[in-house]
Amino acid sequence: RVIRLVLQWAAMYGDLLQEDDVAMAFLEEFYVSVSDDARMMVAFKEQLAELEKTVKQISEDAKAPQKKHKVLLQQFNTGDERAQKRQPIRGSDEVLFKVYCIDHTDTTIRVPVAASVKEVISAVADKLGSGEGLIIVKMNSGGEKVVLKPNDVSVFTTLTINGRLFACPREQFDSLTPLPEQEGPTTGTVGTFELMSSKDLAYQMTTYDWELFNCVLELELIYHTFGRHNFKKTTANLDLFLRRFNEIQFWVVTEICLCSQLSKRVQLLKKCIKIAAHCKEYKNLNSFFGIVMGLSNVAESRLALTWEKLPSKFKKFYAEFESLMDPSRNHKAYRLTAAKLEPPLIPFMPLLIKDMTFTHEGNKTFIDNLVNFEKMRMIANTARTVRYYRSQPFNPDAAQANKNHQDVRSYVRQLNVIDNQRTLSQMSHRLEPRRP
């Protein structure tokens, strides 16, 4: 049983074990121990051969040239990729990232994705020539600032969509201001994507979301729930997938609020509802809910003149979609819908995260100094759900888009959005001032 358990563990987390010296040492020591015992117990010999093959394969893979760390570009932008298959980000991969100073000048550092804030400070200090009293601050587009703790990890991927990292002495904290680029676009892209079919847009969104979702490691759910700093591991793939949901939401609101023409806004609403419908057909609940939540954003839902001119058929579709977001009875409407769908399925990840967090915070990890296995089983069930959703491959050739599919593909991977709710609300009021 122990040998079988170790083999299953190695099969499931082989790539991750290669990054862990302790795990690799354990596997090799375990193999030696089983080899010794197999001399006296014939029953071990068959499993020994399988164990030897597994340990040898993992060791060879760890030394292979393609397993060496990648260097990722700032903001992890993947919009320029072509047919290249997306690979999960590993903690040992390095990132080239800009860290800004109080005067908005920047310095580019190169550190591992899983680097702690302490390591980031050290890298910045090397570039600036002085690190005395430096702090690392993350700032969103609205100017909200948070001083990061020295042991915080995954600092690059946990930024908001238009968030940036700043380095400054503690006494200059109050003087930090957002960069102009953090405000987002000043013109919409309606002229570009109104020429693209709704089905093509939904298909390319689904292809990209599937790539992101497929890269999320189950262990990242555990790290996120129990605290990244407790494991000193990255949750980069999960962070990027969660950020994609927010990106879709704000994309919908941004495009509507940047459209000054009433008739064009009505067409945009119709287009977004059509895209949401196709995403639902593709079982892409991530983008589906992102679009629906974008449409229900207060900056958009208050545009009475725009909604009044929307055909009743589309109002009915939207009402049906919105009902699936009903949070009553623990999101029963969504759970029933998801339960009826077969894999491959891209889930509404924020709800799965909420389930795991609720389980973690509502149950003790230890009871009378013993592991609370009931809690672990509940958390494992959520992780198994993710595995089930990915148990069948998403076939990217199943619905190949038309001639301009490369343009559509590039567009959905490089969305430029305004993520400042105050700014969006102000724009909304300029479009349709409050009625007396």
UniProtKB/Swiss-Prot annotation:
Native organism: Rattus norvegicus
Gene Ontology biological-process entries: adenylate cyclase-activating G protein-coupled receptor signaling pathway; adenylate cyclase-modulating G protein-coupled receptor signaling pathway; calcium-ion regulated exocytosis; cellular response to nerve growth factor stimulus; ganglion development; heart development; hormone secretion; insulin secretion
Domain of life: Eukaryota
Compartment list: Cytoplasm; Membrane
Cysteines joined through disulfide linkages: none
Residues annotated as domain Ras-GEF: 197-434
Designated name of the protein: Rap guanine nucleotide exchange factor 4
Classification via Pfam families: RasGEF
